Amino acid sequence: MLDDDCSPTSSSEMSNASSREASITSRSSSTSGNNSLPEDRGAVVQLPTLNPSDYRWHPFPGDSSVLQRKAIGVEALVGIRDANSRGEYDFYNNIVLRVGNALELTLTRLKRAFVKAMLDARFENPSIACYGVWGQNKEQYLPHIQYKSFKSQSEALAWANNCIIIQATSLTGSELRAERLKKRRAQAVPQPSNPLDIIIYADVANQRNRLEPGTEVNILFLFNHLIWDGKGRYFTSELVQRATTILDQEKENIMPTHRWGEEKSRLDPPILDVMLVNLDKMGPDYDLAHRKLLNSQLQVGLSWGLPLTRNPGEPLQIRHCISREDSTKITDAVRARLGPKYNIGHLGHAATVLSLLKNNPIPPSTQDTAFLFSPLPVDGRPYLLEERKTPRYGNAQAAAVVELQKLASWGIKSDNLNGVKVALDDLAKKVKEDYDYWLTNLVAWRFKSSCTSEFIAFGSAIYQTPYLDPGAPKVKVGTGTSTDMVFLKAFCNDGRAESIIAYTMHGPSGKELFQVDDCFGGVDVLGSNAFIRMDTWKDAIRLTLCYNSGCFSDAVANSFTTDVAQYMLAYSW
C-alpha cells in the first residue's frame, strides 16, 4: 500500500467493545531471536570538547565566493555520503489544492508564480539553498555545508526554473516519487538529491490547459534531509502563500532583480554560536546526563523489534486514518483517564509499543531481559538564542529516548478485563515521564550538537541501516542473533498539519484562490529501520508507517499500523 491510500477506521466497523478488545489482544505466537539486554553494554564513548570556531562559516579554499562550514549534529548523521547519495531519509510534503473561482490559471502560469516566489524566498532566507559537499573532512564520508550566490539575474532565474517542475499527469505523488527513485538508481554513481525540488502536477491534458475551478492541483515538495529538518514542512506553506499573493496581484511575469551576494549575511548562524547555554558553562550534571543519553541512543539498535527480511525493496508509507468522530473520542479519553497534561502523542507512542509486542511476542526465554529504547526527534529551536526575521528551516534537531526495561512486563495483563486500557495508561505515563525528563534537560540538545565525526564513526554501525540494493553487504542488526529484527523503534508526533497550512489560501485582495484539501508527508526509508509518524488533519488522527518493502511485507506493515490504530480506538471504548 502506498502513501496515497487511506483506510478510515470507524467504531462502527466492529460490533462491540469487548469483541474488539479481544481481537487486538490475541495473535498467534511467532518465533523470535534472543534480543535481550547484554550485561556489559560497552565502554562509554568520550566525545571531544567542541570548539565553536571549527564550525563557523568561512570561504571555500577553492573558490572564495563560496561560503562553507562543517556539518554538525544531525547533519553529520543524515549527511553520511553514501547514504545521502542514495536518498536515505529524503522526505516530502504534499499539499493538495483545489482551484477557486476567482482565478484564471494554467500549470505554466502557476510555475511562473512559484519561480518568482522561490527567488524572493531565497534572497530573504538563503540557507534554504545550501547544499552538501564531501571530501574535505578527515573522515571522507562527512559533509561540509556550502552556499554559493548568483553572478547574474539570468543565473538566478535558471536556478529557480530548475527547482520548479510542472507535470500534466494522472500519476499520483507516490508514483512520481517512485519514478524519480528509479532514475536515480539507474545512475552509474548515485548523486545526492537537490536541497529542494518542487513538482506541481495536475490531471489535465497539457501544461497550458486552463485549470477549471474545482480542479485538484498537487504541490509536491522533495527535501534533502541534510539541509532541512521536519520544520521544512512549514516552508511549503510559506511558498504556497507567496505564490498565491503573486497570482492575486498578477505579478508572476515580473521577475525580481535582487542584489545577489547581499543575502550571504543572512545565512543561518552556526548552531554552537546561538545555543542558549554556553558549552564552557556545562558542569558535572551535564556530563552525567550527556553520558546517559549517549548510552541510551547506542542501545536503540539492540532493542526488541519486528522480524526482518533482507531483499531489494522500495521506500513506502502506509497511511491509516482514524475518523474525526473517533479521533475526538480518543482525545477525550486521554484527558479523562490521564489528565490535561497528556495528549494523543503519549497514547500513540504507548499504542506503538503494544502493537510491537503483539506482532512479535517476546518468548519465555527472554521475558525478563528483552528491552526497548525508543528514540524520538525533538525540535531544538527552543534551545537557541537568536533574533530572526526568517524561520530557521535547517537542521536544528535535538533528541530524547523512551526506555522500557523488561519490555514484556509492559504488555497487556490477560487477567485484567481492562487490560488494554491499563497497559496503555502505564505506558503513556512512562512515555510522558521520559519525554519530560529529556525536554527539561538541555542535554537533549547538547547531545545532538555534539554528534561530531568521532561519534558518528563509532555509532554508524548502529545508526546507519544497510542499503537494500542487490549487491549490498548483508550485515546484522541488533544483537546479531540468528533472527534479525527491523529497527521499528521510533515514534514521531508531528502535531497538527493545520498548523502548517490553513484550509484556504487568500490573496491580498481577500479573494479565495485555493482551497487546501490535504497536507501530508513522509520519509524515504531505504534500509532496515521503520517508524510511525502521527499527525492530525481536520481533527482526524493519521498514522503513517515509513518502511522499506524489502524489510517486511505490506501485509505485516499494514497489520502493525492497524493494530496501533485499534489500540488507540480501544482506549476510547
Swiss-Prot record:
Low complexity composition bias: residue spans: 7-36
Disulfide-bond pairs as recorded: none
Pfam families given in the database record: Tri3
Transferase is among the record's keywords: yes
Domain of life assignment: Eukaryota
Entry's EC annotation: 2.3.2.-
Region feature Disordered, mapped onto this chain: 1-40
Keyword Transferase in annotation: yes
Molecular-function annotations in GO: acetyltransferase activity
Listed GO biological process terms: mycotoxin biosynthetic process
Keywords from the named record: Acyltransferase, Transferase
Gene3D superfamilies in UniProt: Chloramphenicol acetyltransferase-like domain (3.30.559.10), Nonribosomal peptide synthetase, condensation domain (3.30.559.30)
InterPro entries xrefs: CAT-like_dom_sf, Tri3/Sat12/Sat16/Mac1
Pathway recorded for this protein: Mycotoxin biosynthesis
Purpose: Putative 15-O-acetyltransferase; part of the satratoxin SC2 cluster involved in the biosynthesis of satratoxins, trichothecene mycotoxins that are associated with human food poisonings. Satratoxins are suggested to be made by products of multiple gene clusters (SC1, SC2 and SC3) that encode 21 proteins in all, including polyketide synthases, acetyltransferases, and other enzymes expected to modify the trichothecene skeleton. SC1 encodes 10 proteins, SAT1 to SAT10.
Miscellaneous comment: Trichothecenes are sesquiterpenoid toxins that act by inhibiting protein biosynthesis.
Family to which the UniProt record says this protein belongs: Belongs to the trichothecene O-acetyltransferase family.
Protein name: Putative 15-O-acetyltransferase SAT12
